[in-house]
């Protein structure tokens, strides 16, 4: 049996569409509000946090590496997240209790590549771009 056609079927068509919307994954995620609640950033693109510790995360098979990450406690809500530190040797610019700016890591809230469970990356350390520190354009401010 197909959809209703003809006169006086608008209400039924509208109601059916309204019900069926909720079976669409993207629509449900956008409109339920639970994804926003679960998101540590609370809908924002970036968030500041304090570095708790440096951690090494083992890469998934078939790769073999220890990816350099940091545990960060967000200032806005106190949630703890793991953030990836990009580029070679950039972990040396970060110390415990530093203030870092953290951004998403691509893939809309999913882990990227071979790094399991890491959904964020470090962008700035002590209000200085990590890329500028890496390239030697800027130095870490003395604290």
UniProtKB/Swiss-Prot annotation:
Chief site of localization: cytoplasm
Keyword Cytoplasm: yes
Record GO cellular component, one term: cytosolic small ribosomal subunit
Keywords: Cytoplasm, Endoplasmic reticulum, Ribonucleoprotein, Ribosomal protein
Region: Disordered, residue numbers: 1-27
Superkingdom assignment: Eukaryota
Family matches, as InterPro entries: NA-bd_OB-fold (IPR012340), Ribosomal_uS12 (IPR006032), Ribosomal_uS12_euk/arc (IPR005680)
Record field: compositional bias (Basic and acidic residues): 16-27
Record field: compositional bias (Basic residues): 1-15
Classification via Gene3D superfamilies: Nucleic acid-binding proteins
Biological processes per GO annotation: cytoplasmic translation
GO molecular function, one term: structural constituent of ribosome
Cellular localisation: Cytoplasm, Cytosol; Cytoplasm; Rough endoplasmic reticulum
Subunit structure: Component of the 40S small ribosomal subunit.
Family: Belongs to the universal ribosomal protein uS12 family.
The protein, known as: Small ribosomal subunit protein uS12
Organism of this sequence: Ictalurus punctatus (Channel catfish)
């Amino acid at each position: 049996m197909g959809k209703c056609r003809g006169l006086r079927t608008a209400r039924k068509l509208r109601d059916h569409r309204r019900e069926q919307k909720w079976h669409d994954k993207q629509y449900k995620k956008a409109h339920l509000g639970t994804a926003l609640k679960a998101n540590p950033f609370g809908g924002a693109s970036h968030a500041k946090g304090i570095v708790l510790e440096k951690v090494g995360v083992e890469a998934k098979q078939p790769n073999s590496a220890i990816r350099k990450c940091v545990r960060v406690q967000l200032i806005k809500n106190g949630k703890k997240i793991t953030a990836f530190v990009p580029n070679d040797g950039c972990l040396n610019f970060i110390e415990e209790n530093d203030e870092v700016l953290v951004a998403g890591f691509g893939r809309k809230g999913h882990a990227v590549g071979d790094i399991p469970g890491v959904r964020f990356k470090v962008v700035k350390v002590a209000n200085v771009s990590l890329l500028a520190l890496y390239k030697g354009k800027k130095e870490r401010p003395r604290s």
